[in-house]
UniProtKB/Swiss-Prot annotation:
<keyword id="KW-1053">Target membrane</keyword>
<dbReference type="InterPro" id="IPR012674">
    <property type="entry name" value="Calycin"/>
</dbReference>
<dbReference type="GO" id="GO:0070062">
    <property type="term" value="C:extracellular exosome"/>
</dbReference>
<dbReference type="GO" id="GO:0031640">
    <property type="term" value="P:killing of cells of another organism"/>
</dbReference>
<comment type="function">
    <text>Component of the membrane attack complex (MAC), a multiprotein complex activated by the complement cascade, which inserts into a target cell membrane and forms a pore, leading to target cell membrane rupture and cell lysis. The MAC is initiated by proteolytic cleavage of C5 into complement C5b in response to the classical, alternative, lectin and GZMK complement pathways. The complement pathways consist in a cascade of proteins that leads to phagocytosis and breakdown of pathogens and signaling that strengthens the adaptive immune system.</text>
</comment>
<keyword id="KW-1052">Target cell membrane</keyword>
<comment type="similarity">
    <text>Belongs to the calycin superfamily. Lipocalin family.</text>
</comment>
<keyword id="KW-0325">Glycoprotein</keyword>
<dbReference type="InterPro" id="IPR022272">
    <property type="entry name" value="Lipocalin_CS"/>
</dbReference>
<keyword id="KW-0473">Membrane attack complex</keyword>
<keyword id="KW-0179">Complement alternate pathway</keyword>
<keyword id="KW-0399">Innate immunity</keyword>
<keyword id="KW-0964">Secreted</keyword>
<dbReference type="GO" id="GO:0019841">
    <property type="term" value="F:retinol binding"/>
</dbReference>
<dbReference type="InterPro" id="IPR002968">
    <property type="entry name" value="A1-microglobln"/>
</dbReference>
<dbReference type="GO" id="GO:0001848">
    <property type="term" value="F:complement binding"/>
</dbReference>
<keyword id="KW-0472">Membrane</keyword>
């Protein structure tokens, strides 16, 4: 039961696009992610492979309070037609976990819908900027709360890529104090069969 509880916790953390509670916006506020354009002619085949999470910009209070507990996080991406199969690898209590999810197609290349647990609904995902071989900036929105994520193929992050990310963060009305940089070491490459959570089949 303890193992199962940890698995559920990890799924909730990943589905939220960050690590926890969000500051609430008025219900009447427009959806910020609807105005964000995906990369022109987004190519899921070129986007496939491994991405390392370098930084997250978010207004999540829990993220700011518990940022010192952030773990190195890697994404393994495989195209499934217009959709993408995404496996996230990160540690929880020192153990490597794999969470398998499906970024569902929406009819717009580069714009995806990720089913998620809980009453706050699905996560909207936009691959807004990428050169495919070095970096990618993804926006995630759930219950009208937006986060900006920077992924890279390898570390360290170049100054030009960091500058592009910081510009995106500013455009999302987030400050530098709301940016969390993730560890650059300790990445998980695999998880054993007892630490795999398949959200696709649920």
């Amino acid at each position: 039961m303890v193992l199962r509880g940890r698995a559920v916790l990890l799924a909730v953390l990943l589905a939220a696009g960050s690590l926890g509670r969000w500051a609430q916006k008025p219900r009447g506020a427009p959806s910020a992610i609807s105005a964000i354009q995906p990369k022109a002619n987004f190519d899921a085949q070129q986007f496939a492979g491994t991405w390392l999470l370098a930084a997250v910009g978010s207004a999540c209070h829990f993220l700011q309070e518990q940022g010192h507990r952030a773990e190195a996080t890697a994404l393994h991406v495989a195209p499934q037609g217009a959709a993408m199969a995404v496996s996230t690898f990160r540690k929880l209590d020192g153990i490597c976990w794999q969470v398998s999810q499906r970024y569902g197609a929406t009819g717009v290349p580069g714009r995806f819908l990720l089913p998620a647990r809980g009453p706050r609904g699905a996560v909207h995902v936009v691959a807004a900027e990428t050169d495919y071989h070095s970096f990618a900036v993804l926006y995630l929105e759930r219950a009208r709360q937006l986060s900006v994520k920077l992924y890279v193929r390898s570390l360290p992050v170049s100054d030009s890529v960091l500058g592009a990310f910081e510009q995106r963060v500013a455009q999302a009305n987030l400050t530098q104090d709301q940016v969390l940089f993730f560890p650059t070491y300790g990445f998980c490459e695999a998880a054993d069969q007892f630490h795999i959570l398949d959200e696709v089949r649920r």
